Amino acid sequence: MIQPQTHLNVADNSGARELMCIRILGASNHRYAHIGDVIVAVIKEAVPNMPLERSEVVRAVIVRTCKELKRDNGMIIRYDDNAAVVIDQEGNPKGTRVFGAIARELRQLNFAKIVSLAPEVL
């Protein structure tokens, strides 16, 4: 469960290392974001000499959460960290690589480009 002020790792090579959630997009009364939700975040830590810089406001999609994700078949998936992938206004990733495992639910949410870049889909 991601809420405003939550710090997340970045799971791509866009240049950001750590994000802080400042808003959850989609509905005005969402308190928590789950896997597949789009958030507005600020970059708290960035790699030097990259396009994205510290204190820049970006959009990101949640790809991993520590909170369990329960599937319809009864399977429960839990990750070790909270992570997101930085995206542009059209929903395409800003980076060219995605690190770590990605949930299968992103494919149904029209993030097929992120799923295709991921090394492992759970």
Curated annotation (Swiss-Prot):
GO terms for MF: large ribosomal subunit rRNA binding; structural constituent of ribosome
Q: Which InterPro entries match?
A: Ribosomal_uL14, Ribosomal_uL14_bac-type, Ribosomal_uL14_CS, Ribosomal_uL14_sf
GO biological process annotation, one example: translation
Q: Does the keyword rRNA-binding apply?
A: yes
Where do the coiled-coil regions begin and end?
A: none
Localisation:
Plastid, Chloroplast
**UniProt keyword terms in alphabetical order:** Chloroplast, Plastid, Ribonucleoprotein, Ribosomal protein, RNA-binding, rRNA-binding
SUPFAM superfamilies noted in UniProt = Ribosomal protein L14
Family annotation (PANTHER family): 50S/60S RIBOSOMAL PROTEIN L14/L23 (PTHR11761), LARGE RIBOSOMAL SUBUNIT PROTEIN UL14M (PTHR11761:SF3)
Fetch the NCBIfam families from UniProt: rplN_bact
- According to UniProt, the name of this protein is Large ribosomal subunit protein uL14c
Species of the source: Ceratophyllum demersum
Upper taxonomic lineage: Eukaryota, Viridiplantae, Streptophyta, Embryophyta, Tracheophyta
